[in-house]
């Protein structure tokens, strides 16, 4: 999901949510590595259900970053088997294993998939060009390059999309491998495997969510079932919270351990020997994994989201749903994040603080079972809008300070004459203090009328030039003698021809030193001739003026003028650009400049456009919330803009009515035509390729080879926004569907929707019943089964692919030497999940046993009292001080300190009314306000009646 750095931020804020995975090491006997005993006790604790988001496995196995990529698709699939087996040995599920591969996505997700795949094709093209350049350079140096190496191209990662031949092969390979494990591994005898391949519509993680919701709807469901999901996406954390399952955790690679590894580049791979490649493969096989405990995260959130003295009952489940919803504003796969929010800048904390301040006045929460309370959302965004300009200014100031710090570090690194605060232990005279002229006033040899500092800075170049060519030394001396009477520290006194001739003499024997010297002298001369253009020294501690601030912005070029930026009504120029250049979010007037730069509209049309964008964004956040909590509300809806509105623009949204039409998902080939670039058309049947490449095609404009990439204020190129035209669904489907009659039978078989597949071993409790009802009876009937018996509920149907007992399943891979499997050792059926009778409720089910608490009182206090208290000023006007979740409390100084206060409290408990002498001061001064002080305190005395 598009929440960059969310896992890193979350694990640092709540450190106890992660723990390392304990792995059993395989034993080696006589040089043979024995497999791990799957049936043995799990050192990480027992687990019922494991869910694999397979795209998080297929991608790193097919194009890894830290090791050489597999040569063939068979090798990729063998790597998938090995990786999956390692994950299973860590988790060891006992009841259910669900393998979910991304199928056809909703239209809202296709826009992001389209951007990624077009960008991937562009990067692959650049990588192949770079490889060709490196090989050409090697050949120019006389190295012999094999033709096979020159002809080899990188594997197209866009093949990992539903409907391609690779995905069809992946589905067959997964069915074979799980059947092989069920037939041969005793630890799998009670395991029930569900495979949801690319022919089942929906994203992998959301198909898993649908499965969990369907199991919770079964009346026999065990509320203490333990769940684990494997994947790399940040949205798995939101999905884990959205299940409202008390025993849930996430398994993922340890990204912190991988930060220290240097990723080998492409030309490094070309130079590696077989031993070096094998060492990288072995190193990659040992990378550590982490558990992310959603139950511990729930503990943290119970402290973080606690709002005392609410006018309504505090419901942790509803509060967690609100927290998940607010995180959507910081980024997701379906909508751009709000301009003022960024996870790395603690935007989630800002939203939580606003939510806690606004919630008492809302009378209810922001969400309820996936539906939005738009009145509450409008109030939260209004508060965020009030802070928006301050957020932009603070971000700009931080960027300026960071840039200045980088410049200082660069200057200290490049300038060898800066002592960096250390005492110079060399008692010789520094080079800056050495005289450039002799005692008679004559210029020193080789000085070229430079200052002492210039001479010291260029001592290396002059020394190399003098040592490398005596003719250059003589020329420098002659130039010094000729200008003896015109000495100056400036370089403007000698002509261009003289400089060129002096440098030209030295080119023969020491070109590099002479060229460096020439460049530095010419640079000094240019600065001397144009003193107005030379940069002035900058004081890092001085606040920048208005002109300096303008010059320091990214718009320091011609676009940084104070006038309105030019409006473009057509397609932007292909290549990298930054539309934030002229917006200047840190200056007044940024609102109109933002819409002019991002949406290309004149000033008079901004208000009408803003309303349309806000309405679409409200529809978007409503769609995303329903997608996470109830399933896909519409397969055809999408956000029709590349950018988000400001938080201050969300006015009057409480009156909006948001509804969705469910529609139906695209077929696989229709999605391929929606998201693939023309460079990846080899993944499509031949009949569709001309639609992408033929200029006469009615949808040719959907597949530009060059397109603009907006940095959008980001520093890293991979975060840039790809500005592609949105697909016109009507035109696309009309063009694609007229080609369907030309498809072959094998091609039609990849363009269908199917059910999930259920695989069990012949020792499973359901085996005899399923075999008799589905494959022995002449009229097979669907078999319904409940959760209590095996931990799985649903309906089994006869296999649509023609599974037959007493036959063999053939291995689909030519590599690996894997055997064929007897179909008597396992059973394969089609599987359908139980139907949900009503919308899923965001509650903990009755009968659950809470997990053991992992947070200490100190951990909870660190969250509840996260703001420091010692700098809060004491005010005698209200006598209130902040005290964490209780917000404020009454306090006044008391004679005798805290011990006297405790004594007074004990006295008031023993005697309901204090004696009269306690109301007067012994010195005759004003009476102490003991009564009001006690009644206003939260330490209320007991009254006896």
Curated annotation (Swiss-Prot):
<dbReference type="GO" id="GO:0043144">
    <property type="term" value="P:sno(s)RNA processing"/>
</dbReference>
<keyword id="KW-0378">Hydrolase</keyword>
<dbReference type="GO" id="GO:0019843">
    <property type="term" value="F:rRNA binding"/>
</dbReference>
<dbReference type="GO" id="GO:0030846">
    <property type="term" value="P:termination of RNA polymerase II transcription, poly(A)-coupled"/>
</dbReference>
<dbReference type="InterPro" id="IPR027073">
    <property type="entry name" value="5_3_exoribonuclease"/>
</dbReference>
<feature type="compositionally biased region" description="Low complexity">
    <location>
        <begin position="543"/>
        <end position="561"/>
    </location>
</feature>
<keyword id="KW-0269">Exonuclease</keyword>
<feature type="region of interest" description="Disordered">
    <location>
        <begin position="473"/>
        <end position="510"/>
    </location>
</feature>
<dbReference type="GO" id="GO:0000448">
    <property type="term" value="P:cleavage in ITS2 between 5.8S rRNA and LSU-rRNA of tricistronic rRNA transcript (SSU-rRNA, 5.8S rRNA, LSU-rRNA)"/>
</dbReference>
<dbReference type="GO" id="GO:0004534">
    <property type="term" value="F:5'-3' RNA exonuclease activity"/>
</dbReference>
<dbReference type="GO" id="GO:0110103">
    <property type="term" value="C:RNA polymerase II termination complex"/>
</dbReference>
<keyword id="KW-0698">rRNA processing</keyword>
<feature type="compositionally biased region" description="Basic and acidic residues">
    <location>
        <begin position="474"/>
        <end position="495"/>
    </location>
</feature>
<keyword id="KW-0540">Nuclease</keyword>
<dbReference type="GO" id="GO:0071028">
    <property type="term" value="P:nuclear mRNA surveillance"/>
</dbReference>
<dbReference type="GO" id="GO:0030847">
    <property type="term" value="P:termination of RNA polymerase II transcription, exosome-dependent"/>
</dbReference>
<dbReference type="InterPro" id="IPR017151">
    <property type="entry name" value="Xrn2/3/4"/>
</dbReference>
<dbReference type="GO" id="GO:0034244">
    <property type="term" value="P:negative regulation of transcription elongation by RNA polymerase II"/>
</dbReference>
<comment type="subunit">
    <text>Interacts with RAI1; the interaction is direct, stabilizes RAT1 protein structure and may stimulate its exoribonuclease activity. The interaction also stimulates RAI1 pyrophosphohydrolase activity, probably by recruiting it to mRNA substrates.</text>
</comment>
<keyword id="KW-0806">Transcription termination</keyword>
<dbReference type="GO" id="GO:0005634">
    <property type="term" value="C:nucleus"/>
</dbReference>
<dbReference type="InterPro" id="IPR004859">
    <property type="entry name" value="Xrn1_N"/>
</dbReference>
<keyword id="KW-0539">Nucleus</keyword>
<dbReference type="GO" id="GO:1904595">
    <property type="term" value="P:positive regulation of termination of RNA polymerase II transcription"/>
</dbReference>
<protein>
    <recommendedName>
        <fullName>5'-3' exoribonuclease 2</fullName>
        <ecNumber>3.1.13.-</ecNumber>
    </recommendedName>
</protein>
<dbReference type="GO" id="GO:0090730">
    <property type="term" value="C:Las1 complex"/>
</dbReference>
<comment type="similarity">
    <text>Belongs to the 5'-3' exonuclease family. XRN2/RAT1 subfamily.</text>
</comment>
<dbReference type="InterPro" id="IPR041412">
    <property type="entry name" value="Xrn1_helical"/>
</dbReference>
<dbReference type="Pfam" id="PF17846">
    <property type="entry name" value="XRN_M"/>
</dbReference>
<dbReference type="GO" id="GO:0000956">
    <property type="term" value="P:nuclear-transcribed mRNA catabolic process"/>
</dbReference>
<dbReference type="Pfam" id="PF03159">
    <property type="entry name" value="XRN_N"/>
</dbReference>
<keyword id="KW-0507">mRNA processing</keyword>
<dbReference type="GO" id="GO:0110155">
    <property type="term" value="P:NAD-cap decapping"/>
</dbReference>
<feature type="region of interest" description="Disordered">
    <location>
        <begin position="912"/>
        <end position="945"/>
    </location>
</feature>
<keyword id="KW-0804">Transcription</keyword>
<feature type="region of interest" description="Disordered">
    <location>
        <begin position="524"/>
        <end position="564"/>
    </location>
</feature>
<comment type="function">
    <text>Possesses 5'-&gt;3' exoribonuclease activity. Required for the processing of nuclear mRNA and rRNA precursors. May promote the termination of transcription by RNA polymerase II. Essential for vegetative cell growth and chromosome segregation.</text>
</comment>
<keyword id="KW-0805">Transcription regulation</keyword>
<dbReference type="GO" id="GO:0000398">
    <property type="term" value="P:mRNA splicing, via spliceosome"/>
</dbReference>
<dbReference type="GO" id="GO:0003723">
    <property type="term" value="F:RNA binding"/>
</dbReference>
<dbReference type="GO" id="GO:0071035">
    <property type="term" value="P:nuclear polyadenylation-dependent rRNA catabolic process"/>
</dbReference>
């Amino acid at each position: 999901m598009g929440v960059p750095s969310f896992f890193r931020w979350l694990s640092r804020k709540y450190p106890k949510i992660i723990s390392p995975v304990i792995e059993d090491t395989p034993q080696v006997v006589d040089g043979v590595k024995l497999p791990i005993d799957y049936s043995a006790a799990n050192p990480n604790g027992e687990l019922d259900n494991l869910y694999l988001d397979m795209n998080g496995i297929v991608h790193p196995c097919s194009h890894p970053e830290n090791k050489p990529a597999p040569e063939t698709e068979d090798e990729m699939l063998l790597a998938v088997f090995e990786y999956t087996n390692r994950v299973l040995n860590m988790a060891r599920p006992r009841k259910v294993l669900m393998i979910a591969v991304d199928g056809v996505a909703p239209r809202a997700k296709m826009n992001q998939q389209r951007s990624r795949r077009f960008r991937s094709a562009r990067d692959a093209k650049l990588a192949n060009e770079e490889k060709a350049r490196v090989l050409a350079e090697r050949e120019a140096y006389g190295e012999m390059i094999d033709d096979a190496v020159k002809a080899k191209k990188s594997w197209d990662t866009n093949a990992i999309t539903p409907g391609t031949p690779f995905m069809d092969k992946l589905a067959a390979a997964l069915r074979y491998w799980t059947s092989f494990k069920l037939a041969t591994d005793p630890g799998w005898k009670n395991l029930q495997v569900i495979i949801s391949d690319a022919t089942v519509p929906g994203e992998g993680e959301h198909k898993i969510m649908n499965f969990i919701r369907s199991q919770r709807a079964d009346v026999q469901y065990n509320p203490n079932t333990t769940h684990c999901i494997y994947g790399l996406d940040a949205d798995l954390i939101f999905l884990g919270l959205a299940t409202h399952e008390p025993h849930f955790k996430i398994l993922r690679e340890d990204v912190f351990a991988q930060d220290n590894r240097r990723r080998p580049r492409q030309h490094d791979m070309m130079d590696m020997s077989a031993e070096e490649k094998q060492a990288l493969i072995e190193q990659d096989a040992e990378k550590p994994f982490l558990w992310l405990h959603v139950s511990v995260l729930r503990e943290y959130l119970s402290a973080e989201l606690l709002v005392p003295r609410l006018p309504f009952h505090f419901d942790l489940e509803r509060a967690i749903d609100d927290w998940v919803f607010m995180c959507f504003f910081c980024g997701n796969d379906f909508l751009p994040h709000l301009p003022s929010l960024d996870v790395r800048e603690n935007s989630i904390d800002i939203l939580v603080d606003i939510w806690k301040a606004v919630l008492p006045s809302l009378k209810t929460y922001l969400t309820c079972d996936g539906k939005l309370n738009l009145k509450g959302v409008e109030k939260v965004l209004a508060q965020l809008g009030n802070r928006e300009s301050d957020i932009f200014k603070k971000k700009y100031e931080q960027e300026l300070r960071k840039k200045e710090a980088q410049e200082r570090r660069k200057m200290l690194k490049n300038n060898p004459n800066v002592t960096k605060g250390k005492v110079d232990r060399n008692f010789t005279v520094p080079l800056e203090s050495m005289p450039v002229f002799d005692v008679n006033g004559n210029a020193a040899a080789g000085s070229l009328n430079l200052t002492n500092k210039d001479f010291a800075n260029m001592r290396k170049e002059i020394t190399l030039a003098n040592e490398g060519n005596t003719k250059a030394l003589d020329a420098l001396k002659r130039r010094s003698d000729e200008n003896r009477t015109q000495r100056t520290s400036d370089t403007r006194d000698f002509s261009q021809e003289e400089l060129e001739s002096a440098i030209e003499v030295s080119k023969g024997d020491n070109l590099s030193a002479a060229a460096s010297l020439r460049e530095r002298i010419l640079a000094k001369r240019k600065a001397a001739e144009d003193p107005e253009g030379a940069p002035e020294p900058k004081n890092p501690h001085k606040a920048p003026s208005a002109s300096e601030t303008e010059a320091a912005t990214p718009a320091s070029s011609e676009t940084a003028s104070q006038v309105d930026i030019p409006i473009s009504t057509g397609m932007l120029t292909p290549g990298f650009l930054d539309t934030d250049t002229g917006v200047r979010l840190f200056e007044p007037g940024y609102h109109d400049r933002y819409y002019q730069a991002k949406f290309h509209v004149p000033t008079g049309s901004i208000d009408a456009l803003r309303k349309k964008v806000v309405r679409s964004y409200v529809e978007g956040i409503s769609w995303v919330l329903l997608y996470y909590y109830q399933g896909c509300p519409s397969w055809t809806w999408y956000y029709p803009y590349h950018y988000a509105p400001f938080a201050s623009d969300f006015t009057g949204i409480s009156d909006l009515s948001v509804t969705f039409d469910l529609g139906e998902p695209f077929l696989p080939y229709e999605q391929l035509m929606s998201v693939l670039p023309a460079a990846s058309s080899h993944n499509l049947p031949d009949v569709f390729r001309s639609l992408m490449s033929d200029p006469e095609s009615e949808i040719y404009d959907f597949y530009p080879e060059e397109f603009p990439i907006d940095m959008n204020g980001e520093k890293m190129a991979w975060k840039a926004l790809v500005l592609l035209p949105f697909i016109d669904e009507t035109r696309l489907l009309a063009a694609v569907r007229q080609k369907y009659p030309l498809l072959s039978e094998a091609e039609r078989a990849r363009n269908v929707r199917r059910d999930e597949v259920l695989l069990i071993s012949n020792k499973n409790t359901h085996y005899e019943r399923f075999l008799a009802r589905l494959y022995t009876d002449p009229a097979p009937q669907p078999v319904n089964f409940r959760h209590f018996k095996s931990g799985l509920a649903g309906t089994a149907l006869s296999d649509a692919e023609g599974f037959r007992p007493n036959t063999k399943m053939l291995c689909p891979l030519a590599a690996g030497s894997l055997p064929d499997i007897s179909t008597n050792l396992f059973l394969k059926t089609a599987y359908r999940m139980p139907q949900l009778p009503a919308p899923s409720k965001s509650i903990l089910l009755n009968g659950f046993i809470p997990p053991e608490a992992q947070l200490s009182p100190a951990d909870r206090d660190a969250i509840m009292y996260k703001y420091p208290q010692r700098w809060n000023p004491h005010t005698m006007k209200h006598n209130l001080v902040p005290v964490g979740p209780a917000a404020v409390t009454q306090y006044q100084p008391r004679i005798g300190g805290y011990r006297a206060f405790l004594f007074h409290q004990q006295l008031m408990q023993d005697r309901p009314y204090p004696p009269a002498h306690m109301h007067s001061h012994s010195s005759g001064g004003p009476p102490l306000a003991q009564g009001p002080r006690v009644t206003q305190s939260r330490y209320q005395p007991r009254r006896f009646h």
